[in-house]
Curated annotation (Swiss-Prot):
Keywords: Endoplasmic reticulum, Fatty acid metabolism, Lipid metabolism, Lyase, Magnesium, Membrane, Metal-binding, Thiamine pyrophosphate, Transmembrane, Transmembrane helix. CDD domains: TPP_BZL_OCoD_HPCL (cd02004), TPP_PYR_POX_like (cd07035). PROSITE patterns: TPP_ENZYMES (PS00187). Belongs to the TPP enzyme family. Residues 477-557 are annotated as: Thiamine pyrophosphate binding. It is a single-pass membrane protein. The keyword Endoplasmic reticulum applies. The chain crosses the membrane at residues 2-22. It catalyses: 2-hydroxyoctadecanoyl-CoA = heptadecanal + formyl-CoA; (2R)-hydroxyhexadecanoyl-CoA = pentadecanal + formyl-CoA. Thiamine diphosphate binds at E102. One of its GO terms (biological process) is fatty acid alpha-oxidation. Its cofactor is Mg(2+); thiamine diphosphate. It comes from Caenorhabditis elegans. This is 2-hydroxyacyl-CoA lyase 2.
Length: 640
C-alpha cells in the first residue's frame, strides 16, 4: 500500500510538473516560495507565477521580438484581435502601415523581404482577414520570399464553439507556409516568433504563419474580466467550472514576464560542396558557347549584388536575366542579352541554370539543347530537378545558394581564366541587336484605331526613367511588352509576382518598395485590368505620404486573354473593359493624374516628367492613364 501511494505521488508530481510546465528546479523553487508568500494573489496564480497586477500584454512580447530582428515596419489592416501588437510595435518605433485590403499588406511585406533582403511582416485580423491574404501568401511561397504573417484568432476557450470569425486557420496555411504555429501561452510568444523568423529565412526562403488567440495578446486583468467567472458560484459544478477557468488563465499567463532571449536565431543557408564547384569549373573551362540564365534566387543574401556582378563578369558568359535578377547588370551591359534566349539555348554547349527553373517559362526544359552540358543551381530540391528526365538532364546539380555557387566558381577559375570566345558573344549580340531593331520598327507603326502604339509609349517611358527608379510589374499584355522594352537600371529595381503570375501585386509591391526607399521613385506598370485590384491603395499612399507613379496601359480589354479567346472561339465574352478615366480615380484619392491619348501623344515625355516631379516633391502620387491600341507584338504569348 505504501509503495502504491509513493508511485501515485510520483505520477501526480510528474503530471503537475508537466502541467505547470516547470522547466527547471529553480522554477519549482520559485513556485513553492510564491505559494507560501501570502501576497494576496489567488493560489493558482502563485503556483503558475502569474503577476495579477501587471498591465503588460502579449502584444508587447511580439513587438519586442520584431524590434530585435530589425523589423522596421508592419503592414496591416486593423482588427480587434491584433490591436495590442500594433500599439506595442508603434511604441517601439516600428512603423505601422495600414492598407485598404489584407492582400495588399502581404504583398507589401513580400516586397520589403525582397528589397531589404530580410524578413517582411504583415499582421491581419482573424477569419476573413486571414482568408483575404491567401493569394499573396501563395505568391510569396512560389516567389520564395521570407515573410511573417501574424494572424489573430478567437479566444482559446471559444475555439470551435462558434465565436466571431473563428475558423480552422492552421489548416489553411499549412500547405502554404514553411512553418505554422499557434501560441496559447504568453511565455511561448518569444520562442515561437524567433523560430518562425528563422524558418522563413533559412534554406529556401518562404512565408511563415503564427496565430495568436485574442486572449494571449490582451492584459491579464481584461482577460480575467471576460473569461466568465461566476462570482456567486454555488454547488460543485459551478465551483469546478470556476476552478477550471482559473487554472486555464493562470497557465496562460504563467511566468509570462520572465526574461527571455529575443535576438535572432542563426539561419541555415545551404552552401555548395567544393567537389561540385570543381565539376562546374571544368565544364566552364571546356565550353565554347556557354550561356548563363540567372533567376530570382541569385539575389538572395548572403552575397551582395555587387559581388555577384563581379562573379558574372569573371565568368564572361552571355547572360539572360529573369525575375528579381532583372537589372542585375544595369541597363546596357555587354554580356546581357534580352531578345534571343531561345536561339542561344539551341546553340549553347554549356547552359548554367542559376536559380532558373525548367517550368513553363522554359517550356518545361524543352528549350534546352540535348547537346548542351547543363548545370543546375538552386536551394530548392524540387525546383532544382523540375521536369528533369522528362525533357532535360543535368550534368551537375547543386542544391545550394545560387550566388555563393557562382562566386566560388569564379574564384576557382582565377584571374587567368580565358573568358568566353568573343565570336560567340559577338554572334549573340548581333542577333539581339537585330531583334531590337525589328522591335524598334514596330514602335514606329501608326495604329489605325486612333490610339497610341503601346510599344512606342513604352520606349518613351524607358527613356524617361531615372537611374534610381524601382519598377513594379503588374499586368498581362501591356506588362509583357514592357518586359522587352523597359530596362531596370540596377539590381533589385524590378519587382514582378514571379512564377505564380499573380495579378494585383501592384499596389502592395509599390507600397513596400516606397517604404524601404522613400526617396526613390517607384513606378507601377499596370494593365487596365490589373490596376483594378489595388487602385484603392492610392488612398494608402496619400495617408502615409508615400507617393508612387502609376502607369496604366488602357486598351479597354483583358488583352492577354483576348488574344487567344477571340480568334479561337469568335467571342469576346468577359474580356472587354471600358476606357475608364483611372486618372480621375487617383485624383479623387488625393493624387495627381493625367490621360495621354492621340490628342496629346506628342507630350507623353513631358507628362511623364511632370509625374516624376510630382512624386519627387513628396506631396502627391501620380497616375498616367495611357489610351493604347492593339498590336501583334505578343501574338501567341499565352502560357499554360
Amino acid at each position: 500500500m505504501v509503495l502504491f501511494l509513493i508511485i501515485a505521488a510520483i505520477i501526480i508530481g510528474l503530471l503537475l510538473w508537466k502541467w505547470l510546465d516547470v522547466r527547471s528546479t529553480d522554477e519549482l523553487t520559485s513556485m513553492v516560495k510564491l505559494l507560501g508568500s501570502g501576497n494576496g494573489q489567488h493560489v493558482l496564480s502563485n503556483a503558475f507565477q502569474v503577476d495579477e497586477k501587471s498591465k503588460r500584454h502579449g502584444g508587447e512580447l511580439v513587438a519586442s521580438v520584431l524590434k530585435a530582428h530589425d523589423v522596421e515596419e508592419i503592414f496591416v489592416l486593423c482588427g480587434g484581435h491584433i490591436s495590442p501588437i500594433l500599439v506595442a510595435a508603434e511604441k517601439l518605433g516600428i512603423k505601422i502601415v495600414d492598407t485598404r485590403h489584407e492582400v495588399t499588406a502581404v504583398f507589401a511585406a513580400d516586397a520589403v523581404a525582397r528589397l531589404r533582403q530580410s524578413i517582411g511582416v504583415a499582421a491581419v485580423t482573424a477569419g476573413p482577414g486571414l482568408t483575404n491574404t491567401i493569394t499573396a501568401v501563395k505568391n510569396a511561397q512560389m516567389a520564395e520570399s521570407p515573410l511573417l504573417l501574424i494572424g489573430g484568432a478567437a479566444p482559446t476557450l471559444l475555439k470551435g464553439r462558434g465565436a466571431l470569425q473563428d475558423i480552422d486557420q492552421m489548416v489553411l496555411f499549412r500547405p502554404l507556409c514553411k512553418y505554422v504555429a499557434r501560441v496559447e501561452r504568453l511565455r511561448d510568444i518569444v520562442p515561437t516568433v524567433r523560430e518562425a523568423i528563422k524558418a522563413a529565412k533559412s534554406g529556401c526562403p518562404g512565408p511563415v504563419f503564427v496565430e495568436f488567440p485574442v486572449d494571449v495578446l490582451y492584459p491579464y486583468e481584461l482577460v480575467v474580466k471576460e473569461i466568465g467567472f461566476n462570482p456567486n458560484a454555488k454547488g460543485f459544478i459551478q465551483r469546478a467550472l470556476n476552478f477550471y477557468l482559473r487554472c486555464h488563465v493562470s497557465r496562460q499567463f504563467g511566468n509570462a514576464w520572465a526574461p527571455q532571449t529575443i535576438t535572432p536565431l542563426p539561419t541555415n543557408i545551404p552552401m555548395p560542396k567544393s567537389e561540385k564547384i570543381q565539376e562546374i569549373v571544368q565544364l566552364v573551362k571546356s565550353a565554347k558557347r556557354p550561356v548563363l540564365l540567372i533567376g530570382s534566387q541569385a539575389t538572395l543574401p548572403p552575397v551582395k549584388p555587387a559581388d555577384l556582378v563581379k562573379a558574372v563578369e569573371a565568368l564572361g558568359c552571355p547572360v539572360f536575366l529573369g525575375g528579381m535578377a532583372r537589372g542585375l547588370l544595369g541597363k546596357d551591359h555587354p554580356l546581357q542579352m534580352r531578345q534571343v534566349r531561345r536561339d542561344a539555348l539551341k546553340d549553347a554547349d554549356l547552359t548554367i541554370l542559376a536559380g532558373t527553373v525548367c517550368d513553363f517559362r522554359l517550356s518545361y526544359g524543352r528549350t534546352l539543347s540535348k547537346k548542351s552540358k547543363i548545370v543546375a543551381l538552386n536551394r530548392n530540391s524540387s525546383q532544382l530537378t523540375k521536369n528533369e528526365k522528362a525533357f532535360w538532364n543535368s550534368d551537375v546539380s547543386v542544391q545550394a545558394d545560387v550566388a555563393t555557387s557562382l562566386v566560388q566558381v569564379a574564384n576557382a577559375l582565377g584571374a587567368n581564366h580565358t573568358t568566353t570566345p568573343t565570336e560567340w558573344v559577338k554572334s549573340l549580340r548581333e542577333k539581339d541587336d537585330e531583334k531590337e531593331s525589328a522591335n524598334a520598327k514596330k514602335m514606329e507603326q501608326k495604329l489605325t484605331n486612333g490610339f497610341l502604339n503601346p510599344l512606342n509609349f513604352l520606349r518613351t517611358l524607358d527613356q524617361s526613367l531615372p537611374d534610381d527608379a524601382i519598377l513594379v510589374a503588374d499586368g498581362g499584355d501591356f506588362v509583357g511588352s514592357a518586359a522587352y522594352i523597359v530596362r531596370p537600371r540596377g539590381p533589385l529595381q524590378w519587382l514582378d509576382p514571379g512564377a505564380f503570375g499573380t495579378l494585383g501585386v501592384g499596389g502592395g509591391f509599390a507600397l513596400g518598395a516606397k517604404t524601404v526607399y522613400p526617396k526613390r521613385p517607384v513606378y507601377i506598370i499596370w494593365g487596365d485590368g490589373s490596376c483594378g485590384y489595388s487602385l484603392m491603395e492610392y488612398d494608402t499612399f496619400a495617408r502615409h505620404k508615400l507617393p508612387v507613379i502609376g502607369i496604366v496601359g488602357n486598351d479597354a480589354c483583358w488583352t492577354q486573354i483576348a488574344r487567344e479567346q477571340v480568334p479561337m472561339f469568335q467571342s469576346s465574352v468577359a474580356v472587354d473593359l471600358a476606357r475608364t478615366r483611372y486618372d480621375n480615380v487617383a485624383k479623387s484619392l488625393g493624387s495627381w493624374g493625367e490621360t495621354i491619348d492621340e490628342s496629346n501623344a506628342d507630350s507623353a515625355r513631358k507628362i511623364l516628367d511632370e509625374a516624376l516631379a510630382v512624386c519627387r516633391s513628396g506631396e502627391q502620387s501620380a497616375l498616367v492613364n495611357v489610351l493604347i491600341g492593339k498590336t501583334d507584338f505578343r501574338e501567341g504569348s499565352i502560357s499554360v
